[in-house]
């Protein structure tokens, strides 16, 4: 095998070399774990036009405003995996950050949707995800000390959701006023750092642990 036993960066370079020979490339991202996302981020930062994707397919946790609650839980889950490492990259935020630097054509997939004229998505079931999200989210917010920081996270997650949505065909039809609300990547990085510095945020992570 060309990649067996090689360091991750070399593996990415081999894959990139193969991809550069394909004229039309679409990519399916099934979930947002960093081990799956890191290759995409590496390629997007490569900025080689031969690696441009025609379309990137993502799980639909972005098409409706109420899905921002799900994004809050995704952000928290990612932070909790390695809460002892303050420099840890949050995968969902890393994806949005990369997309702001290198905008892509996105399509959101949910259970039952046909894509590429031959494949059918099995996940996510948006109704099931919403029910599970509401149960967990509401349970956290019962703690009065955490309600305010959860609201901060919700507002932040909604901004991330709008960024992803703006790169879909449906989202591109947004009014110009909505598009103007999308800022540069560093603005969101600064806001995320501010939220993580809130004392109640540390209390929230301790509560969830």
Model-derived regions, located:
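Short acidic, S/G/P-rich loop/turn micro-motifs used as interaction or catalytic elements
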Residues: 2-6, 34-35, 63-65, 127-129
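Generic alpha-helical structural element
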Residues: 4, 29, 84-88
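Active-site metal-binding motif and surrounding structural segment of the metallo-beta-lactamase
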Residues: 5-58
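Flexible, acidic/histidine-containing loops and adjacent segments that form or flank the divalent-metal
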Residues: 42, 46-209
């Amino acid at each position: 095998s060309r990649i067996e036993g090689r360091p991750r960066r070399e593996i990415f370079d081999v894959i990139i070399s193969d991809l550069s020979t394909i004229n039309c490339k679409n990519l399916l991202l099934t979930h947002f774990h960093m081990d799956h996302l890191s290759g995409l981020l590496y390629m997007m930062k490569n900025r080689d036009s031969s690696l441009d994707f025609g379309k990137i397919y993502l799980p639909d946790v972005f098409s409706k405003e109420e899905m921002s609650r799900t994004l809050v839980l995704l952000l928290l889950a990612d932070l909790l995996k390695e809460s002892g490492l303050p420099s840890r990259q949050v995968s969902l935020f890393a994806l949005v950050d990369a997309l702001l630097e290198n905008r892509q054509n996105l399509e959101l997939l949910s259970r039952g949707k046909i894509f590429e004229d031959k494949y059918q998505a099995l996940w996510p079931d948006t109704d099931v995800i919403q029910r599970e999200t509401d149960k967990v989210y509401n349970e956290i917010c019962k703690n009065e000390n955490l309600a305010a920081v959860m609201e901060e996270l919700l507002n932040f997650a909604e901004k991330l959701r709008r960024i992803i949505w703006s790169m879909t065909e449906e989202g591109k039809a947004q009014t110009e006023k909505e598009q103007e609300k999308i800022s540069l990547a560093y603005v969101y990085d600064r806001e995320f750092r501010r939220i993580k510095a809130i004392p109640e945020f540390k209390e929230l992570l301790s509560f969830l642990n």
